[in-house]
């Protein structure tokens, strides 16, 4: 009857077909992942973090040897902008040389491969100029205390840049300051330049760095202007016994 006819209609699968159907029922959904712009090794992955760190330290050391405000320009009564540029251009030039030497070593000695080598180097020239301008202003405005501020700002940038782990895993304070510090944008842009990807963050970083550079130079010029104005306190400093 009906049961007999139904039993004859049950498909009789062979072992291979049974195994295939069992696998489908056991794992009905499969996830296929395809990495985009994957870094080939840890060195390439960490390069966007350590390259700007070295440029910041290089500018910091340069201003330990070069005064942030050119004394000769101050002495002859030059304009404040000329004084600021006279103190910034030598360190910016040193930053360009440092960038060229650093990337040559990373590429030919370490084996760093860059998806956009020319863009990476040009971008790092801007980074070196920006970092030099920021450090110049801190030293020109705050004197010896500026060196402490330079180190403090470096620590804040290292902990909020998201260079080692996603910044979202950091405490809320570092998430809050992340978008407002230049190194955050530098790290994000270098990832796109070294391993590939959308260039939107690169152009944003260029705009941010240009703004920081212009603002820092303007503040340095203001500090130079203040140095040119003599006050009673500067003419007659308090005596200390």
At which residue positions do the language-model features occur?
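Membrane-spanning alpha-helical segments of multipass transporters and channels
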Residues: 2, 7-241
């Amino acid at each position: 009857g009906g049961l007999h006819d139904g039993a004859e209609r049950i498909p009789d699968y062979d072992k291979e077909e049974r195994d295939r159907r069992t696998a489908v029922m056991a794992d009905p959904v499969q996830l296929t992942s395809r990495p985009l712009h994957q870094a080939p090794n840890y060195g390439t992955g960490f390069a966007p973090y350590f390259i700007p760190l070295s440029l910041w330290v290089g500018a910091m050391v340069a201003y330990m040897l070069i005064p942030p405000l050119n004394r000769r320009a101050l002495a002859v009564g030059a304009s404040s902008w000329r004084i600021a540029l006279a103190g910034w251009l030598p360190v910016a030039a040193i930053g360009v040389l440092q960038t060229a030497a650093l990337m040559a070593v990373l590429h030919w000695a370490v084996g760093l491969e860059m998806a956009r080598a020319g863009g990476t180097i040009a971008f790092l020239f801007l980074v070196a100029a920006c970092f030099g301008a920021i450090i110049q202003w801190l030293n020109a405005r705050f004197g010896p205390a500026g060196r402490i501020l330079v180190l403090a700002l470096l620590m804040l940038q290292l902990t909020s840049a998201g260079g080692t782990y996603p910044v979202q895993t950091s405490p809320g304070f570092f998430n809050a300051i992340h978008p407002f510090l230049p190194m955050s944008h530098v790290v994000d842009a270098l990832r796109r330049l070294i391993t590939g990807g959308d260039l939107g963050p690169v152009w944003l970083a260029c705009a941010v760095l240009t703004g920081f550079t212009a603002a820092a130079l303007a503040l340095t010029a203001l500090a130079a202007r203040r140095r040119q104005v003599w006050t009673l306190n500067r003419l007659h400093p308090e005596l200390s016994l």
